[in-house]
């Protein structure tokens, strides 16, 4: 017989299952403890947004580090743009961001149902696909082309913060 060995992929798989099924209040407590110990304490004005966003932040997360990384865009006041990603913001992407912001100003309630028609309209008018709209918006809102779904990002940030981030000078 061979000796037993530590299988990290199996442990991470079990941890992912545990994170998906755990009570979100308990998960939030664990996340705040983790951040306080290993990262930086979550600011009190951001805690409510993080707590409400755990439903989607924990998707595909295998560790508390993954949840922290997925929610980093909520925790920061100023976005640090990934330089490789900011290069993707060309003139067409700037137009998409500007057009989205114009239409976004007109909506009162943030939900997938109110955001989807705006995105679909931008896809048509800019003769592009979802990536052509979603990617520039994700970069503008989070500083990276990777992250949660675009509707989740917008809803979690709230109208005021989204407008502030979409009008960032770097994107002009």
Regions found by a protein language model. Give the residues of each.
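Short helix-capping/linker segments at secondary-structure and domain boundaries
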Residues: 20-24, 65-66, 143-150
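Charged substrate- and nucleic-acid-binding regions of tRNA-handling and nucleotidyl-transfer enzymes
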Residues: 113-172
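A conserved active-site cap/scaffold subdomain adjacent to cofactor or substrate pockets
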Residues: 1-38
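Small-residue-rich helix-loop
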Residues: 24-126
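Amphipathic alpha-helical interaction elements
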Residues: 3, 16-20, 42, 105-108, ...
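Short, hydrophobic/amphipathic alpha-helical patches that form generic packing surfaces
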Residues: 13-17, 56-62, 135-142
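Non-catalytic, well-ordered alpha-helical scaffold segments
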Residues: 8-12, 25, 51, 55, ...
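Structural motif
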Residues: 1-7, 44-50, 124-132, 145
């Amino acid at each position: 017989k061979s000796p037993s060995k530590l299988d990290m992929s199996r442990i991470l798989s079990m941890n992912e299952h545990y994170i998906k099924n755990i009570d979100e209040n308990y998960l939030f407590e664990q996340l705040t403890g983790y951040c306080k110990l290993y990262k930086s304490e979550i600011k009190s004005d951001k805690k409510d947004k993080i707590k409400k966003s755990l439903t989607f932040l924990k998707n595909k997360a295998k560790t508390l580090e993954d949840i922290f990384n997925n929610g980093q865009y909520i925790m920061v006041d100023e976005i640090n743009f990934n330089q490789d990603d900011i290069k993707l913001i060309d003139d067409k992407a700037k137009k998409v961001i500007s057009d989205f912001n114009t239409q976004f100003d007109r909506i009162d309630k943030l939900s997938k149902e109110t955001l989807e028609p705006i995105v679909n309209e931008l896809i048509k008018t800019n003769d592009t696909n979802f990536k052509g709209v979603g990617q520039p918006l994700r970069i503008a809102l989070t500083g990276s082309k990777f992250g949660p779904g675009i509707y989740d990002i917008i809803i979690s940030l709230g109208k005021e913060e989204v407008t502030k981030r979409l009008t960032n000078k770097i994107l002009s």
